[in-house]
Amino acid sequence: MLKRILSLTAIFSSLFVTSAFAEVSEETAYILNSFLFLVSGFLVMLMALGFCLLESGMVTSKSVSAIAAKNIGLYSISGIMFWFIGYNLAYGIPEGGYLGSFTTWTDSSALADGYSASSDWFFQMVFCAATASIVSGTLAERIKIWPFFLFAAILTGIIYPIEMGWQWGGGWLSAAGFSDFAGSTLVHGAGGAAALAGAIVLGPRLGRYDEGGKLVPFASSSIPLATAGTFILWFGWFGFNGGSQLAMGTFDDVNAVGTIYINTNLAAAGGVVTAAVITRLWTVSYTHLTLPTKA
Protein backbone atom coordinates (compact mmCIF):
# COMPACT_ATOMS: atom_id res chain seq x y z
CA MET A 1 0.00 0.00 0.00
CA LEU A 2 2.80 2.37 0.93
CA LYS A 3 4.61 1.62 -2.32
CA ARG A 4 1.44 2.36 -4.30
CA ILE A 5 0.98 5.71 -2.52
CA LEU A 6 4.60 6.66 -3.17
CA SER A 7 4.27 5.69 -6.83
CA LEU A 8 1.13 7.78 -7.28
CA THR A 9 2.79 10.70 -5.50
CA ALA A 10 5.77 10.50 -7.85
CA ILE A 11 3.49 10.42 -10.90
CA PHE A 12 1.44 13.42 -9.82
CA SER A 13 4.60 15.32 -8.87
CA SER A 14 6.09 14.77 -12.31
CA LEU A 15 2.87 15.93 -13.95
CA PHE A 16 2.90 19.08 -11.82
CA VAL A 17 6.53 19.89 -12.64
CA THR A 18 5.92 19.29 -16.34
CA SER A 19 2.90 21.59 -16.39
CA ALA A 20 4.66 24.20 -14.27
CA PHE A 21 7.46 24.55 -16.80
CA ALA A 22 5.30 24.14 -19.88
CA GLU A 23 5.56 26.90 -22.46
CA VAL A 24 3.16 29.73 -21.70
CA SER A 25 0.70 31.02 -24.25
CA GLU A 26 1.57 33.88 -26.58
CA GLU A 27 -0.79 36.20 -24.72
CA THR A 28 0.65 35.26 -21.32
CA ALA A 29 4.19 35.89 -22.57
CA TYR A 30 3.02 39.25 -23.94
CA ILE A 31 1.64 40.19 -20.51
CA LEU A 32 4.74 39.02 -18.62
CA ASN A 33 7.15 40.78 -20.98
CA SER A 34 5.17 44.03 -20.80
CA PHE A 35 5.03 43.72 -17.01
CA LEU A 36 8.82 43.38 -16.91
CA PHE A 37 9.20 46.57 -18.96
CA LEU A 38 6.80 48.54 -16.75
CA VAL A 39 8.19 47.43 -13.39
CA SER A 40 11.80 47.77 -14.54
CA GLY A 41 11.02 51.19 -15.98
CA PHE A 42 9.57 52.23 -12.64
CA LEU A 43 12.79 51.15 -10.91
CA VAL A 44 14.89 53.06 -13.43
CA MET A 45 12.68 56.11 -12.93
CA LEU A 46 13.63 56.01 -9.23
CA MET A 47 17.22 56.52 -10.35
CA ALA A 48 16.27 60.10 -11.23
CA LEU A 49 15.66 60.62 -7.51
CA GLY A 50 18.91 58.83 -6.73
CA PHE A 51 20.89 61.09 -9.04
CA CYS A 52 19.21 64.15 -7.55
CA LEU A 53 20.01 63.14 -3.96
CA LEU A 54 23.57 62.11 -4.77
CA GLU A 55 24.33 65.34 -6.60
CA SER A 56 22.58 67.47 -3.98
CA GLY A 57 24.59 65.84 -1.22
CA MET A 58 27.94 66.24 -2.96
CA VAL A 59 27.70 69.88 -4.07
CA THR A 60 28.01 72.94 -1.85
CA SER A 61 24.93 74.05 0.08
CA LYS A 62 24.30 77.10 -2.11
CA SER A 63 23.79 74.90 -5.19
CA VAL A 64 21.35 72.34 -3.78
CA SER A 65 18.18 74.07 -4.99
CA ALA A 66 19.60 74.47 -8.50
CA ILE A 67 20.55 70.78 -8.61
CA ALA A 68 17.04 69.75 -7.56
CA ALA A 69 15.46 71.98 -10.22
CA LYS A 70 17.87 70.68 -12.85
CA ASN A 71 17.02 67.04 -12.17
CA ILE A 72 13.26 67.59 -12.22
CA GLY A 73 13.60 69.66 -15.38
CA LEU A 74 15.78 67.22 -17.28
CA TYR A 75 13.45 64.32 -16.53
CA SER A 76 10.45 66.31 -17.74
CA ILE A 77 12.27 67.42 -20.88
CA SER A 78 13.39 63.85 -21.57
CA GLY A 79 9.83 62.55 -21.37
CA ILE A 80 8.49 65.18 -23.77
CA MET A 81 11.33 65.01 -26.29
CA PHE A 82 11.44 61.21 -26.40
CA TRP A 83 7.69 61.14 -27.05
CA PHE A 84 7.82 64.00 -29.56
CA ILE A 85 10.61 62.75 -31.85
CA GLY A 86 13.10 60.62 -29.92
CA TYR A 87 11.45 57.19 -30.05
CA ASN A 88 10.80 57.19 -33.78
CA LEU A 89 14.26 58.59 -34.47
CA ALA A 90 15.60 55.45 -32.81
CA TYR A 91 13.10 52.81 -33.87
CA GLY A 92 11.93 54.22 -37.19
CA ILE A 93 15.37 53.67 -38.66
CA PRO A 94 15.71 51.49 -41.81
CA GLU A 95 17.56 48.20 -41.32
CA GLY A 96 21.28 48.96 -41.38
CA GLY A 97 20.53 52.67 -41.67
CA TYR A 98 21.60 55.78 -39.80
CA LEU A 99 18.53 57.90 -39.11
CA GLY A 100 14.91 57.28 -38.19
CA SER A 101 11.95 59.56 -38.74
CA PHE A 102 11.20 62.91 -37.10
CA THR A 103 7.68 61.91 -36.09
CA THR A 104 5.73 61.66 -32.84
CA TRP A 105 5.33 58.29 -31.11
CA THR A 106 2.05 56.44 -31.66
CA ASP A 107 0.90 53.18 -30.10
CA SER A 108 1.25 50.29 -32.54
CA SER A 109 0.92 47.37 -30.13
CA ALA A 110 0.38 43.92 -31.62
CA LEU A 111 0.32 40.54 -29.91
CA ALA A 112 2.92 39.24 -32.36
CA ASP A 113 5.46 41.78 -31.08
CA GLY A 114 5.64 39.96 -27.76
CA TYR A 115 5.21 43.09 -25.64
CA SER A 116 3.18 46.28 -25.41
CA ALA A 117 4.58 49.16 -27.46
CA SER A 118 3.66 51.64 -24.73
CA SER A 119 5.53 49.61 -22.09
CA ASP A 120 8.58 49.57 -24.36
CA TRP A 121 8.32 53.33 -24.87
CA PHE A 122 8.27 53.91 -21.12
CA PHE A 123 11.24 51.60 -20.52
CA GLN A 124 13.29 53.26 -23.25
CA MET A 125 12.30 56.75 -22.11
CA VAL A 126 13.74 56.30 -18.62
CA PHE A 127 17.00 55.12 -20.21
CA CYS A 128 17.01 58.35 -22.20
CA ALA A 129 16.51 60.38 -19.02
CA ALA A 130 19.33 58.48 -17.30
CA THR A 131 21.67 59.55 -20.10
CA ALA A 132 20.90 63.19 -19.35
CA SER A 133 21.31 62.58 -15.61
CA ILE A 134 24.90 61.44 -16.20
CA VAL A 135 25.66 64.80 -17.77
CA SER A 136 23.88 66.67 -14.97
CA GLY A 137 26.20 65.24 -12.32
CA THR A 138 29.34 66.20 -14.21
CA LEU A 139 28.18 69.73 -14.95
CA ALA A 140 26.99 70.43 -11.40
CA GLU A 141 28.04 73.96 -10.39
CA ARG A 142 29.53 74.48 -13.85
CA ILE A 143 26.53 75.61 -15.92
CA LYS A 144 23.43 77.75 -15.49
CA ILE A 145 20.08 76.02 -15.49
CA TRP A 146 18.53 77.27 -18.76
CA PRO A 147 21.52 76.50 -21.01
CA PHE A 148 21.55 73.04 -19.44
CA PHE A 149 17.85 72.56 -20.20
CA LEU A 150 18.49 73.50 -23.84
CA PHE A 151 21.29 70.97 -24.05
CA ALA A 152 19.12 68.32 -22.34
CA ALA A 153 16.44 68.82 -25.01
CA ILE A 154 18.96 68.32 -27.81
CA LEU A 155 20.57 65.32 -26.12
CA THR A 156 17.35 63.47 -25.30
CA GLY A 157 15.45 64.41 -28.44
CA ILE A 158 18.14 64.04 -31.09
CA ILE A 159 21.64 62.93 -30.05
CA TYR A 160 20.82 59.95 -27.84
CA PRO A 161 17.93 58.57 -29.96
CA ILE A 162 20.05 58.63 -33.12
CA GLU A 163 23.02 56.75 -31.68
CA MET A 164 20.69 54.45 -29.74
CA GLY A 165 18.93 53.52 -32.99
CA TRP A 166 22.22 52.52 -34.58
CA GLN A 167 22.16 49.36 -32.47
CA TRP A 168 18.87 48.87 -30.60
CA GLY A 169 16.85 50.20 -33.53
CA GLY A 170 18.47 47.87 -36.06
CA GLY A 171 20.80 50.48 -37.56
CA TRP A 172 24.28 50.18 -39.01
CA LEU A 173 25.98 49.13 -35.77
CA SER A 174 23.50 46.30 -35.37
CA ALA A 175 24.09 45.23 -38.97
CA ALA A 176 27.83 45.25 -38.28
CA GLY A 177 27.35 42.79 -35.42
CA PHE A 178 27.77 45.22 -32.52
CA SER A 179 25.81 44.32 -29.39
CA ASP A 180 24.98 46.36 -26.29
CA PHE A 181 23.05 44.48 -23.63
CA ALA A 182 22.07 47.19 -21.14
CA GLY A 183 23.41 50.46 -22.47
CA SER A 184 27.07 50.26 -21.48
CA THR A 185 27.90 52.11 -24.70
CA LEU A 186 24.62 53.56 -25.91
CA VAL A 187 23.65 55.09 -22.55
CA HIS A 188 26.87 55.48 -20.60
CA GLY A 189 29.09 56.08 -23.60
CA ALA A 190 26.79 58.80 -24.91
CA GLY A 191 26.23 60.35 -21.48
CA GLY A 192 29.91 60.12 -20.60
CA ALA A 193 31.03 61.66 -23.89
CA ALA A 194 28.58 64.53 -23.50
CA ALA A 195 29.66 65.04 -19.88
CA LEU A 196 33.34 65.03 -20.83
CA ALA A 197 32.76 67.53 -23.63
CA GLY A 198 30.86 69.79 -21.24
CA ALA A 199 33.57 69.58 -18.59
CA ILE A 200 36.28 70.42 -21.14
CA VAL A 201 34.38 73.38 -22.57
CA LEU A 202 33.21 74.78 -19.23
CA GLY A 203 36.30 73.99 -17.20
CA PRO A 204 36.43 73.36 -13.43
CA ARG A 205 33.92 74.73 -10.95
CA LEU A 206 34.54 78.33 -9.92
CA GLY A 207 36.88 78.46 -6.95
CA ARG A 208 37.92 74.83 -7.33
CA TYR A 209 41.58 75.81 -7.78
CA ASP A 210 43.55 78.69 -6.27
CA GLU A 211 45.82 81.02 -8.24
CA GLY A 212 48.67 78.54 -7.99
CA GLY A 213 46.58 75.72 -9.42
CA LYS A 214 46.22 73.94 -6.09
CA LEU A 215 42.97 72.06 -5.44
CA VAL A 216 40.65 73.84 -3.01
CA PRO A 217 38.53 71.42 -0.91
CA PHE A 218 34.77 71.96 -1.21
CA ALA A 219 32.50 71.11 1.71
CA SER A 220 29.72 68.74 0.62
CA SER A 221 26.24 69.82 1.67
CA SER A 222 25.10 66.47 3.10
CA ILE A 223 26.83 63.09 3.13
CA PRO A 224 23.66 61.30 4.40
CA LEU A 225 21.78 62.76 1.41
CA ALA A 226 24.45 61.50 -0.98
CA THR A 227 24.38 58.09 0.70
CA ALA A 228 20.60 57.87 0.33
CA GLY A 229 20.99 58.71 -3.34
CA THR A 230 23.59 55.98 -3.73
CA PHE A 231 21.30 53.32 -2.29
CA ILE A 232 18.41 54.44 -4.49
CA LEU A 233 20.67 54.24 -7.55
CA TRP A 234 21.83 50.80 -6.44
CA PHE A 235 18.20 49.75 -6.18
CA GLY A 236 17.37 51.23 -9.58
CA TRP A 237 20.16 49.34 -11.31
CA PHE A 238 18.27 46.10 -10.79
CA GLY A 239 15.55 47.45 -13.08
CA PHE A 240 18.05 48.98 -15.49
CA ASN A 241 19.97 45.76 -16.04
CA GLY A 242 17.31 43.18 -15.21
CA GLY A 243 14.76 44.76 -17.52
CA SER A 244 17.29 44.65 -20.35
CA GLN A 245 16.64 40.92 -20.62
CA LEU A 246 13.53 42.20 -22.46
CA ALA A 247 11.54 39.04 -21.77
CA MET A 248 10.05 37.17 -18.83
CA GLY A 249 7.85 34.63 -20.57
CA THR A 250 10.05 31.56 -20.26
CA PHE A 251 11.91 29.60 -17.60
CA ASP A 252 15.27 30.64 -19.08
CA ASP A 253 14.32 34.33 -19.20
CA VAL A 254 13.33 34.45 -15.54
CA ASN A 255 16.52 32.64 -14.54
CA ALA A 256 18.53 35.11 -16.61
CA VAL A 257 16.90 38.06 -14.83
CA GLY A 258 17.84 36.53 -11.48
CA THR A 259 21.43 36.08 -12.62
CA ILE A 260 21.53 39.68 -13.82
CA TYR A 261 20.35 40.85 -10.39
CA ILE A 262 23.17 38.93 -8.71
CA ASN A 263 25.79 40.30 -11.13
CA THR A 264 24.48 43.83 -10.67
CA ASN A 265 24.71 43.58 -6.91
CA LEU A 266 28.22 42.10 -7.07
CA ALA A 267 29.34 44.88 -9.42
CA ALA A 268 28.10 47.61 -7.08
CA ALA A 269 29.55 45.93 -4.00
CA GLY A 270 32.84 45.34 -5.80
CA GLY A 271 32.99 48.99 -6.82
CA VAL A 272 32.62 50.13 -3.22
CA VAL A 273 35.25 47.76 -1.83
CA THR A 274 37.73 48.40 -4.66
CA ALA A 275 37.38 52.18 -4.34
CA ALA A 276 37.88 52.01 -0.57
CA VAL A 277 41.02 49.87 -0.88
CA ILE A 278 42.57 51.94 -3.68
CA THR A 279 41.81 55.19 -1.86
CA ARG A 280 43.41 53.85 1.30
CA LEU A 281 46.55 52.70 -0.53
CA TRP A 282 46.83 55.74 -2.79
CA THR A 283 46.15 58.54 -0.34
CA VAL A 284 47.17 56.76 2.89
CA SER A 285 44.23 58.49 4.59
CA TYR A 286 40.69 57.18 4.07
CA THR A 287 38.00 59.61 2.92
CA HIS A 288 34.31 59.14 3.59
CA LEU A 289 33.47 60.79 0.26
CA THR A 290 34.78 57.80 -1.67
CA LEU A 291 32.09 55.20 -1.02
CA PRO A 292 28.89 57.02 -2.09
CA THR A 293 30.39 57.91 -5.46
CA LYS A 294 31.79 54.47 -6.32
CA ALA A 295 28.88 52.11 -5.66
Language-model region placement:
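Single conserved hydrophobic/aromatic residue that forms the stacking wall/gate
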Residues: 288-295
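Membrane-interface helix caps and helix-loop-helix hairpins in membrane proteins
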Residues: 283-284
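Serine/proline-rich low-complexity intrinsically disordered segments, especially terminal tails, linkers
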Residues: 16, 287-288
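Oxyanion-binding "anion nests"
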Residues: 273
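Metal/cofactor- and membrane transport-associated sequence elements
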Residues: 23-210, 220-231, 235-263, 269, ...
